[in-house]
Curated annotation (Swiss-Prot):
Keyword Ribosomal protein: yes
HAMAP family referenced in this protein's UniProt entry, alphabetically: Ribosomal_eS31
UniProt lineage: Archaea, Methanobacteriati, Methanobacteriota, Methanomada group, Methanopyri
Name used for this protein in its record: Small ribosomal subunit protein eS31
GO MF entry, a single one: structural constituent of ribosome
Amino acid sequence: MGVPRRAKLYEVKDGKVERKNPFCPRCGPGVFMADHGNRYACGRCGYTEFKDQPEPKKKK
């Protein structure tokens, strides 16, 4: 059968359980955000956070 999908979102370091992905700030604890490389996205409400935001271009 393998490992349940939800179990893959946690890892154990130094005897403590740590989340690999953040929880959605809108939906609250228990709703993980999906990791899409350059961003995290919530599948429930659609909230998106970008990991590396480029600096806005300055107008002259």
